Amino acid sequence: MDFSLKQLAAATMMMASLAAFSTAAHATITPQQSAVILKTFSDTHVTDFRQFLGALAKSELAQKDNLGPTISAFLDNKALAPEQQNEIYRLLGLYTRLKYGKAATDTLRELVAIPTVNLDDVPQYENPQFLKIADKIKDLAKAFNLNFRNIDNRVYEVSLEGSGDEVVGIHAHADVVPVTPENWVLKDGTQLDPFKVTLIGDRMYGRGTEDDKNGIVVAMYAMKVIKEEQLPLARNFKLLIDTTEETSGDAIPYYFEHNPVPNYNLALDGGYPVVIAEKGSGTVMATFPVRKGE
């Protein structure tokens, strides 16, 4: 199970749960059950979420996992208990992965192929590669029927409107750290292209596959599905794509100088208690002797 597709399902579930309801509840569908559902429907063509739920309701999986009542209530437009809402969110995430997993991976390949690294003596907002990725994201937003704003080539804003006044800010970034191509060699001697996504086993290799172009992809596809399925949104969503996260960090402050700060803010490339670490993580602890003051 590759990382980006896990994130695609998770992001859809998360955004759907934030969008419409405020009651907290624990989802009852386990990772093991999710894996079985994905495997069962991996070769099945799904057209829309309701069709997917209808097919799932007729399967032994729904009976075994007692999902029938939740699915029936949703399809009949009945009020759902908090636990049922979370089950629907999780199923929506699984549906998104089944329907758009390959497309999302292809989009990630296209974004990774754009070498959005910092250039000496060239501001990010004048860097040709950032102008290129801005156009790519703009075209993608248009294809997904999402709103797009380019804030002076500093931040790219992709938004999905809801009925309320509150705004949920989803943060990702388009810039990546520089690469040393000769270091991109696997233990078996395989030479990799840093700006070409290479899938080996259950791992994707390529600069930005984790940090953080996958965050752009999963958020936009999650917004696409929410739009397609016409989910009721009590909050507005704004995906804020930073261009300076790996360098000066001045793009987001520039954005907030000219735009309101969202009511809620989420970073897709790290969140407590889980944080993505591209090359491993570590904790440094230091002690210093106390010196008496004079």
Show the residue positions of the predicted features.
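Short beta-strand-to-loop capping motifs
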Residues: L160, F288-V290
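Polar, glycine-rich mid-to-C-terminal structural blocks
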Residues: G293-E294
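A short, gly/pro- and small-residue-rich
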Residues: L186-L192, G280-F288
